[in-house]
């Protein structure tokens, strides 16, 4: 999936769950803000929205007994581990990796739970 320019959520990333779609928008906004204002505070804010979203999404999956929950949680943990190594100012290649990861994760992994939560 191509990284949208400007980097922003659009309807092609809609999961049909309003709360998840709203949180996905915050992930796009967090990475975009980090690319524009590459500060320690922005990095911490970006990490925080990812942690909160993954917690919320995984909670919804667990509640629905989603069959791919463990696998999906592992993918989230892998991303957070990579993000945990980022230091401000974050290298552009790392921000680009985060953007590419997000635009691929939603349609390949998150879309698997459409209609199942």
From Swiss-Prot:
Arranged from A to Z, the UniProt key words for this protein are: Iron, Metal-binding, Oxygen transport, Transport
Report the InterPro entries cross-referenced here: Haemerythrin (IPR002063), Haemerythrin_Fe_BS (IPR016131), Hemerythrin (IPR050669), Hemerythrin-like (IPR012312), Hemerythrin-like_sf (IPR035938), Hemerythrin_metal-bd (IPR012827)
What are the binding positions for Fe cation 1 in this chain? Answer: 24, 53, 57, 110
One GO MF term on file is: iron ion binding
For this protein, the record's CDD domains field holds:
Hemerythrin
A UniProt-annotated Pfam family: Hemerythrin
Top-level taxonomic group: Eukaryota
* Binding residue positions for Fe cation 2: 57, 72, 76, 105, 110
Q: What does this protein do?
A: Hemerythrin is a respiratory protein in blood cells of certain marine worms. The oxygen-binding site in each chain contains two iron atoms.
Q: How does it assemble?
A: Octamer composed of two types of chains: alpha and beta.
Q: Which family does it belong to?
A: Belongs to the hemerythrin family.
Name of the protein: Hemerythrin subunit alpha
In its UniProt entry, the species of origin is given as Lingula anatina (Brachiopod)
């Amino acid at each position: 999936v191509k990284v949208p320019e400007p980097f922003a959520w659009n309807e092609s990333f809609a999961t049909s769950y309003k709360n998840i779609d709203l949180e996905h928008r915050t992930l796009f906004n967090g990475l975009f803000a980090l690319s524009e204002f590459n500060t320690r505070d922005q990095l911490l804010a970006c990490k925080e929205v990812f942690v909160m979203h993954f917690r919320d999404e995984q909670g919804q999956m667990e509640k629905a007994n989603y069959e791919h929950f463990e696998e999906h949680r592992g993918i989230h943990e892998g991303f957070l581990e990579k993000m945990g190594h980022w230091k401000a100012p974050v290298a552009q290649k790392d921000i680009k990796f985060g953007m590419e990861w997000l635009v691929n994760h939603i349609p390949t992994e998150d879309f698997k739970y459409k209609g199942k939560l």
